[in-house]
């Protein structure tokens, strides 16, 4: 039953975010903000597919224990694409609120992204083996969480300052995604049921994408 429910959920998620992303890229009418948002949605879905498709195959066939390498490789790729996702979201913020300058902030985003990617590439992560060390799961997620925190603050402050009703909950979607993700990083290996938090985390990302799509439909008539 878990295999069917999880596979259907993941399939709907991947098709939805990639489709919405393509619709945004094609329907943005030259609006660079929404083109970036569409690209961001495609990166999100395409990146997650490297992990979710092998997981679905594993659940529906011989089990997760027989898909260690494909699942590990998928997580590895997803860790990088999620970093790209937040860099793109930063540029969505700059475009939407017409931010100029702030080179220090841009450097911080790129610096954290670079540290995150470098940490993800370290062999100590043992991506392709069973039982990746918790310590490296924490190390590589520290710069990622700091990126998320910066994006949360930026969208919260800017939406409030500009009375931006369309993006007023963008910051909350990111808070929720990290709120559900962090316990999985810390405790999923010892308490497997905590892994179920990835479902509401995924829903938070769908909310993020829908905020952008809804705004485009209203602003690009």
Functional labels for PLM-detected ranges:
Residues 1-19:
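Hydrophobic transmembrane alpha-helical segments in integral membrane proteins
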Residues 3-6, 64-76, 129-142, 191-201:
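Non-cytosolic membrane-interface motifs at loop->transmembrane helix junctions
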Residues 17-27, 87-93, 118-123, 142-168, ...:
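Alpha-helical transmembrane segments in multipass membrane proteins, preferentially the mid-helix core
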Residues 21-28, 50-106, 120, 155, ...:
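Internal transmembrane alpha-helix with an interfacial aromatic "cap," most often the third helix
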Residues 26-37, 93-105, 132-133, 157-169, ...:
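Membrane-interface helix-boundary motifs at transmembrane edges
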Residues 46-61, 114-132, 174-194:
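C-terminal ends of transmembrane alpha-helices
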Residues 80-151:
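Membrane-proximal helix-loop-helix units in multi-pass membrane proteins
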Residues 171-217:
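Terminal transmembrane helical module of multi-pass membrane proteins
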């Amino acid at each position: 039953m878990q295999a069917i429910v999880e596979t259907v959920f993941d399939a709907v998620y991947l098709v939805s975010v990639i489709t919405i992303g393509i619709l945004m890229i094609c329907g943005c009418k030259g609006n660079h903000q929404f083109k970036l948002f569409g690209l961001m949605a495609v990166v999100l879905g395409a990146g997650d597919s490297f992990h979710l498709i092998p997981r679905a195959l594993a659940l529906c066939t011989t089990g997760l224990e027989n898909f260690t390498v494909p699942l590990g490789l998928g997580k590895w790729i997803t860790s990088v694409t999620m970093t790209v996702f937040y860099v793109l979201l930063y540029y969505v913020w700059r475009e939407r609120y017409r931010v100029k300058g702030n080179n220090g902030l841009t450097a911080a985003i790129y610096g954290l992204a670079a540290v995150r990617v470098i940490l993800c590439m370290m062999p100590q992560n043992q991506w392709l083996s069973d039982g990746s060390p918790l310590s490296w799961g924490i190390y590589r997620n520290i710069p990622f969480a700091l990126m998320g925190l910066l994006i949360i603050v930026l969208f919260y402050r800017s939406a409030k300052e500009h009375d931006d009703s369309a993006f007023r909950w963008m910051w909350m979607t990111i808070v929720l995604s990290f709120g559900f993700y962090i316990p999985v990083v810390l405790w999923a290996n010892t308490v497997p049921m905590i892994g179920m938090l990835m479902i509401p985390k995924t829903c938070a990302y769908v909310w993020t994408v829908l905020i952008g799509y809804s705004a485009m439909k209203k602003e690009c008539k």
